[in-house]
């Protein structure tokens, strides 16, 4: 735990010098006890906050980029928006005056600085606001304030309610801190952006809160990161999927995009769309964009004769009505020794099924198991491969 005196020390010249010295320690699993003891001998009562800060900075680098001088708490770092996601949001708010009312240690402020016309940050936690001042600098106003008590006249308010309690995630938006419905009421007269967990029931959220703006689901490098509520004045659609990549380009889909797609049997490839597309309910729009079709109208798996660029697909080698015995026989016939199993719409645990299959061959394969109509079907596929490639049939290799 950090207090204000810790922040004052760590942000001072003496603290910076001590952090530079502490950063020479590895704090690996094998050296942690010895490093901590050495730090305690050298820095006494400051040893704990020095060790924590060095380790948090190392953990933060992959998520936030260059944070050599930043200060964090562990909880603040866990909830901090990844830099790529924050930059995407900032771009949508370019040229506006923005107030982040749950600014924490300043990850969103850093992305907004220089993009928005002006930026204000506030948080109820005095330690986090002190850290944000250190992290962002004096040119951005950061103050202590209750997120539910409007304290500026900024055009746009951003809120990122706490979604953890006692180390556990909260899935009910009314249990967030502050609750989502309270945030919506407090800023009903402003343009508002609210970050939420991507696993929310969006229909239920709209019904309970009356929210009528855009719900954007964002993924980064294949992992779904957040759902973001954009009030009507900022909305460009009802539903949006934003797929971001650390390297390369991403894409967006909305419910305004064409959604004409057929339901048909499997073609050469099966494609599992990005999680943001699935959570945003835009599978049909994705299929229409790439000339794909659905295997079942209720299931997110798509099929086609080619794989969209930058996406990994499963090349179909065989298909059969699902039964564990028949699947084991089909895999054995192809000398399968390792298998990736993905499942949709069928009550199966892939890890347990993989163990029960008892494969003894040498060829890596993939299996896609899905509900189609009233039954389940298994597709034996070549090992997953990226778009633009054609994987040879393992039996002919």
Specify the residue positions occupied by each region the protein language model found.
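SAM-dependent transferase fold signal centered on methyltransferase-like domains
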Residues: 1-397
């Amino acid at each position: 735990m950090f207090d204000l005196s810790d922040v004052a020390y760590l942000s001072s010249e003496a603290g910076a010098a001590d952090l530079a010295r502490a950063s020479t320690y590895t704090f690996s699993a094998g050296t942690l006890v010895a490093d901590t003891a050495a730090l305690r001998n050298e820095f006494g009562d400051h040893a704990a906050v020095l060790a924590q800060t060095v380790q948090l900075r190392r953990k933060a680098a992959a998520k936030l980029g260059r944070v050599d001088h930043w200060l964090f708490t562990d909880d603040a770092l866990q909830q901090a928006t990844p830099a790529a996601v924050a930059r995407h949001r900032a771009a949508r708010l370019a040229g506006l005056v923005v107030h982040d009312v749950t600014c924490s240690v300043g990850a969103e402020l850093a992305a907004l600085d220089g993009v928005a016309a002006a930026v204000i940050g506030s948080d109820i936690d005095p330690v986090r606001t002190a850290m944000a001042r250190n992290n962002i600098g004096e040119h951005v106003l950061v103050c202590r304030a209750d997120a539910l008590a409007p304290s500026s006249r900024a055009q746009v308010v951003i809120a990122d309610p706490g979604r953890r309690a006692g180390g556990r995630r909260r899935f009910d938006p009314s249990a967030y801190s502050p609750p989502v419905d309270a945030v919506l009421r407090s800023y009903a007269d402003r343009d508002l952006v609210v970050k939420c967990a991507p696993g929310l029931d969006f229909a239920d959220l709209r019904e309970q809160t009356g929210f009528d703006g855009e719900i954007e689901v964002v993924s980064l490098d294949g992992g779904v990161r957040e759902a973001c509520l954009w009030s009507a004045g900022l909305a460009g659609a009802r539903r949006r999927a934003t797929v971001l990549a650390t390297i390369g380009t991403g894409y967006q889909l909305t419910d305004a995009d064409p959604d004409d797609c057929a339901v048909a049997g499997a073609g050469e490839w099966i494609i599992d769309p990005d999680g943001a597309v699935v959570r945003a309910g835009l599978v049909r729009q994705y299929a229409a964009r790439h000339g794909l079709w659905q295997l079942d109208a209720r299931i997110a798996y798509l099929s086609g004769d080619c794989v969209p660029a930058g996406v990994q697909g499963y090349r179909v080698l065989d298909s059969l009505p699902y039964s564990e015995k028949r699947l084991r026989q089909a895999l054995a016939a192809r000398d399968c020794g390792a298998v990736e199993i993905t499942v949709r719409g069928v009550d199966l645990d892939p890890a347990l099924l993989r163990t029960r299959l008892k494969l003894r061959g040498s060829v890596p394969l993939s299996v896609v198991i899905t509900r189609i109509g009233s039954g389940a079907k298994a597709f034996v596929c070549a090992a997953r491969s990226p778009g633009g490639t054609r994987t040879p049939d393992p039996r002919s290799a």
